[in-house]
Amino acid sequence: MTRACAPYLKKSGNGRVVNISAFIGLSAEGSSIAHATAKAALIHLNRCLAVALAPDVTVNSVAPGLMDGTTMFNRISADNTEAAKQRAVLKRHSSLSDVADQVLTFCRADTVTGQVLVIDGGIVFH
């Protein structure tokens, strides 16, 4: 998708790419090695694209943790979601609006590129 859009983003002189990754791409935990590896690859692609598309396009990534209201959240037992909440220093899960707000922040920022922001209530520090 980014490859197809890159010429138009560059032509605008103010292009933005915001990838949605996951905290698991920065942490060696969890039960899905394939998922964690794919998210880690996306995070590295994010950095490579930031260099390749500069100076006309910024490329950043949001890496959410467990979010209320998502399919994944609803698949996990209440005991496990509560345990995750208790691990977070803020003692709460992230929300879809937390992620949307950060995407907008990245879209507004002119001098931020190649960054990954974890939104998980303070479980993974990066």
Predicted feature locations:
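Active-site helix of classical SDR
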Residues: T2, A38, N46
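Short, small/polar-rich loop/turn modules that mediate ligand/substrate recognition or access, typified
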Residues: A54-T58, V112-G114
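Conserved SDR Rossmann-fold cofactor-binding beta-strand/turn motif
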Residues: T58-D68, V118-D120
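Active-site loop immediately N-terminal to the catalytic Tyr-X3-Lys motif
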Residues: S27-I33, K91
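Alpha-helical segment proximal to the catalytic Tyr-Lys
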Residues: P7, A50-P55
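C-terminal substrate-recognition "lid" of short-chain dehydrogenase/reductases
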Residues: R92-I119, V124
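A glycine/serine/threonine-rich, flexible loop-to-helix segment
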Residues: P64-R87
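Residue(s) in the substrate-gating loop at a strand-loop-helix junction
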Residues: A22
